[in-house]
Structure formats: C-alpha cells, structure tokens
UniProtKB/Swiss-Prot annotation:
Keywords: Cytoplasm. Belongs to the gluconeogenesis factor family. One of its GO terms (biological process) is regulation of cell shape. GO terms for molecular function: LPPG:FO 2-phospho-L-lactate transferase activity. The keyword Endoplasmic reticulum does not apply. The keyword Cytoplasm applies. One of its GO terms (cellular component) is cytoplasm. InterPro entries: CofD, CofD-like_dom_sf, Gluconeogen_factor. This is Putative gluconeogenesis factor. The lineage of its organism: Bacteria, Bacillati, Bacillota, Clostridia, Thermoanaerobacterales. HAMAP family: Gluconeogen_factor. It is found in: Cytoplasm.
Length: 323
C-alpha cells in the first residue's frame, strides 16, 4: 500500500541545480514518486566542464546528483558513482560523470542517456535537462563588465566587486525539453531552489517557454530561499532581493517563499562571515505587498561543517502545502 501511495502521490516539479536541489529531492521522495527534477545544463566548471569540452556533451554533474538523490539502489552504488579519482589523468573526475558520458555515447540523445541511467538506478520520478541545446551562461555586472561562462561568474564578480545586474544565455533562443514543459503544466506544486540563485536556478528560467509554462500551470508555486548569502552571487541580498531577481529574469508570480528562522550557531556565523557570507534576512510585510506568503520555519541542518537545508523538515513543509 505504501508504494501505491508514493506512485499516486502529488505531482511535484523541482527546478534548479547544484547540491541544494539534490538534498531536497532526498526528502521529497519519501512522500511521492511523482517527482520531476528539471536541471540546468549551463555548468562549465570542474569535471563536468572537462567532459563538456572533451566530448561535446552536456554537463553531467548536476543531473548525476539528482539521479543519485532519487535512486533506489544499494548505498554502495551511490558511493561508486560519487567516487572521484585522486590521481592520474582522471584526477578530480567523478565516476558517475563518466558513467553518464558512456551512456550518452550509446544513446541517440543526452535526454535518452539520462532516462537510461535513471532506469538502471531505479529512480523514483524523473530527471530532465531543461534544454538539449549547448548553452553558455553569461553575466552582466552593474559596472558594465560581461562575464563569459558559469564557472567564472562568482570568481570575477568578487574580483570586480560589482553586483550582478542580470544573466543571460547564449544562444538566447534555447529550446526547452518538451517533457519538462508538460510536467510543469501538469504539476500540483512547482518548487524553485534551494541553490545558487544566478548559476543554478535562474538559468532554467531563461530557456524559452519555461516561465510561461510556470505561470500557466495551476500548481502552487514555491521558492525555497537559501539560508546564507553566496559570495560571488548574492552578497548583501535579503530574501526579497532573491525573489526580485527571479522576477527580473522572467518569473511572473509566486505563492510562497520558505525562509529559515532557525538559530545558526555563532561559530558557523563567524566562519561564514570570513567568506563574506551571512544569514539571509527577510521582510514579511514586503512579501505581503507582493501577494506572497512567507513560511518561517527552522529548516537548518549542519552537514560536514556546512550550513544546509534539512531535507526532512523541508519536505514536510512542502508536502503540507498540498493538504
């Protein structure tokens, strides 16, 4: 009966990338298997960037993490696919990236490769790239400088000490994966974040027709705000500024914003402060004026000495909105 309930659970679409998205997926899959993760393919750094350059494929890293978060296999399989080589020509590369690269080699498209890897790992729900186009992410800073490439944006923004004015994709007419649009339209709940605002979440909104599908969908629309500001992207931002950036880049409406009101231990505040990162503040009244409800909850977790969202608490809140 439990599996039946999962299979017939609410239809949830999550949009983003990075570790924040995969963390949340681990919590959500305990409540429903009707999950679609729509993932950015703008990454051009690290092991993903190397494979993108060498093999001409779309970056596998964020998609790999989402697949592993939704997998139903032995823990050893996740350890294997997350393993990073420490020596030789493959140093820094993850086996999971190579697995997906090999799957891409025997498939007619990257979309099919992702589906095949998902089948092998008995994924609950589905993982979709937002586009199959070879897109590059660029950022224009307020001082007029244009940064070329996702991996360079945080570094050069910090160097220039000028806020991000807006980001954009090249080509500007990137076509969405049709199945992603269908699932957005059919969803009960659409969740943006958590994750890097400019390099994980907003790139998805820049793909043609994605914002329009979100707006036309009858789903509840939720933004999960980051707990801490991010150097190179959101220094000095409060939650309202995060949402303003989403609207600036095409999002048209939100129903809820989830913010953390849990107490962050002083030692972590101090350590993050050294990197110019601080807790994200929020103004409930300002959100009310925009017609957005604020959910203030303790969603804080400390994992491996890093501040993260607690996937269980977050999933309970998100599922509670559908009751």
């Amino acid at each position: 009966m439990k599996n039946f309930a999962y299979l017939n659970g609410p239809k949830v679409v999550v949009i983003g990338g990075g570790t924040g998205l995969s963390t949340m997926l681990r919590g959500l899959k305990k409540y429903t298997h009707n999950i679609t993760a729509i993932v950015t393919v703008a990454d051009d750094g690290g092991g993903s960037g190397v494979l993108r350059e060498d093999l001409g494929m779309l970056p596998p890293g964020d998609i790999r993490n989402c697949i592993l978060a939704l997998r139903n296999t032995e823990p050893t399989m996740e350890k294997l696919l997350q393993y990073r080589f420490t020596d030789g020509m493959l140093k820094g590369q993850s086996f999971g990236n190579l697995f997906l690269a090999a799957m891409n080699g025997i498939s007619i498209s990257f979309e099919e490769a992702v589906k095949k890897m998902s089948e092998v790992l008995a994924v609950s729900g589905k993982v979709l790239p937002v586009t199959l186009d070879d897109v590059k992410l660029k950022a224009k800073l307020k001082n007029g400088i244009v940064i070329d490439g996702e991996s360079l944006i945080p570094k050069l923004q910090m160097k220039e000490k000028s806020p991000i004015e807006r980001i954009f994709l090249e080509p500007k007419d990137a076509k969405p994966v049709k199945e992603a649009l269908i699932d957005i339209m059919d969803a009960d709940e659409i969740i943006l974040g958590p994750g890097s605002l400019y390099t994980s979440i907003i790139p998805n909104l820049l793909v043609n027709d994605v914002c329009e599908a979100i707006e036309d969908s009858k789903a509840i629309k939720v933004y999960v705000c980051n707990i801490m500001t991010q150097p190179g992207e959101t220094i000095g931002y409060d939650a309202n500024a995060h949402v303003d950036a989403l609207f600036l880049h095409g999002l048209k409406s939100l129903d809820y914003v989830i913010v953390n009101n849990g107490e962050i231990p002083y030692e972590y505040k101090d350590r993050y402060k050294e990197d110019m990162s601080q807790p994200v503040s929020y103004d409930v009244e300002s959100f009310k004026q925009k017609g957005i409800k604020v959910i203030e909850k303790d969603v804080l977790a400390i994992r491996n000495n890093y501040i993260r969202h607690d996937e269980q608490k977050l999933a309970e809140i998100l599922m509670g909105l559908l009751e």
